Design a protein with these regions (language model features):
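Ribonuclease/tRNase effector modules and their secretory precursors
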Residues: 1-98
Length: 98
């Protein structure tokens, strides 16, 4: 019986978000959440960066994540998603946690 917890979606609480921020800030090379957003990669969009409009939106909302935000842990990386009231979640950033 294999466990697939690495594939599990985890709803983010305010406390969990703080812990994730702490972990990111302790990560070598950390600059800022805005820098992480600026260099975020979209799943299915190859190595393409966010557009300027997308970056502007996320840079103003990244410090005010809400209950629809999620982290998906997979293969040693934390994928941070954001979503609004039923809208599709969008990949914001990827953080190595292993």
């Amino acid at each position: 019986m294999s466990k697939h917890t690495y594939n599990r979606n985890i709803e983010i609480t305010h406390h969990a978000m703080q812990r994730l921020e702490e972990r990111v800030k302790n990560y070598k090379g950390f600059k800022s959440w805005q820098e992480l957003v600026r260099t975020a990669r979209y799943k299915g969009r190859s190595e393409q960066n966010m557009t300027d409009a997308e970056y502007q939106w996320y840079s103003t909302h990244i410090t005010n994540l809400h209950s629809s935000s999620q982290v998906r842990i997979m293969n040693g990386f934390a994928y941070l998603f954001m979503g609004n009231k039923g809208h599709a979640r969008t990949l914001v950033t990827v953080i190595q946690v292993a």
